[in-house]
Amino acid sequence: MSIKSDKWIRRMAEQHGMIEPFEPGQVREADGRRIVSYGTSSYGYDIRCADEFKIFTNINSTIVDPKNFDEKSFVDFKGDVCIIPPNSFALARTMEYFRIPRTVLTVCLGKSTYARCGIIVNVTPFEPEWEGYVTLEFSNTTPLPAKIYAGEGCAQVLFFESDEPCETSYRDRGGKYQGQHGVTLPKT
């Protein structure tokens, strides 16, 4: 398995619709102001956070159970900036829709701009032939409220291509998050 370059990422996005919308360069400024960068980098793609959020709350004082998750544990929010309460988290989604080729697996890492502020971005790998908007998890590890900016970079996707196609892809096995739109809660 080898990591793929900016040239490969551009070709796959432009000719095969792997990333939509796609930014072929690196954007660091918008409307004359500095932003958290997004777009194609040397060996990855910096994804953006959309303006849809689900902010975790303990209003219902329930037990967090990934097999039986209570939707009422979240407050829906739409806006350019999301404030995550101290020691809490929020879910969001990418602005980009992904179509992962059968021979490719991705790994996604949070951007250091957020990590250096105690905000951790977690995303699981995008498996071969998975497609959809990516659900993002932002953890505020600090004792203070934390800001997340919609429309700006939040994590980097690295693309790895195998020497041979997998026997069974995510699509083949009917993965539960295939084709997801919006912020998707846990499913079992």
Swiss-Prot record:
Protein EC: 3.5.4.13
GO molecular function annotations of the record: dCTP deaminase activity; nucleotide binding
Keyword Cell division: no
UniProt KW keywords: Hydrolase, Nucleotide metabolism, Nucleotide-binding
Gene Ontology biological-process annotations: dUMP biosynthetic process; dUTP biosynthetic process; nucleobase-containing small molecule interconversion
Positions of dCTP binding: K111, S112, T113, Y114, A115, R116, T135, L136, E137, Q156, Y170, Q180
Pathway: Pyrimidine metabolism; dUMP biosynthesis; dUMP from dCTP (dUTP route): step 1/2
Pfam families xref list: DCD
Keyword Transmembrane helix among UniProt keywords: no
Catalysis: reaction(s): dCTP + H2O + H(+) = dUTP + NH4(+)
Top-rank taxon, per record: Bacteria
Active site location: E137 (proton donor/acceptor)
HAMAP family xrefs: dCTP_deaminase
Family indicated by similarity: Belongs to the dCTP deaminase family.
Role noted for this protein: Catalyzes the deamination of dCTP to dUTP.
Assembly and oligomerization: Homotrimer.
Protein name: dCTP deaminase
